[in-house]
Amino acid sequence: MSSGNILWGSQNPIVFKNSFGVSNADTGSQDDLSQQNPFAEGYGVLLILLMVIQAIANNKFIEVQKNAERARNTQEKSNEMDEVIAKAAKGDAKTKEEVPEDVIKYMRDNGILIDGMTIDDYMAKYGDHGKLDKGGLQAIKAALDNDANRNTDLMSQGQITIQKMSQELNAVLTQLTGLISKWGEISSMIAQKTYS
């Protein structure tokens, strides 16, 4: 098993091969010895559990990064709409302003809906040659804010999940340490009895 399997962000599948014990003519093969040794089996199970928890945490970490980036990018577009709304507010109630092309493209690419409509459908229904009144501009900003908030929430939930996975990793490591300690004690006692 390569160390790349347990690094943050690794997408590699978990591969684990049980190879505990020693192999020589007196003791038989490694597999025979590990099957007879409950400590080796326990150690193997805990290592597999450790790798599984780590893989889940890795995937969640990648999700958190994506959600954070999406929330940040969406908030930038929302701030851009603030400027357009402020410009529209300087005119009268019928003043219309153009929705920035990069905002339209961003909403289209990320599937952000306004009142259940795509940005293209919304512009076709309420737009006037790519321009919207203040209410329409505010509806677009609200849709962007909702998307940013949703991704921020997903990011927070992901961080909580990672914290829980870290606690589970620590618990498994504690169990591994205890098992290795007991394994060593028993091996030492057997060696003393055998060779004394």
From Swiss-Prot:
The keyword Lipid biosynthesis does not apply. GO terms for biological process: protein secretion by the type III secretion system. Disruption phenotype: Mutant is severely attenuated in virulence. Disruption prevents SpvB-induced F-actin depolymerization in human macrophages without affecting intra-bacterial SpvB protein levels. Effector proteins function to alter host cell physiology and promote bacterial survival in host tissues. May act as a translocator that mediates translocation of SPI-2 T3SS effector proteins from intraphagosomal bacterial cells into the host cells. SseB is required for correct localization of SseC and SseD on the bacterial cell surface. Belongs to the EspA/SseB family. May form a complex with SseC and SseD. Binds to the chaperone SseA. This is Secreted effector protein SseB.
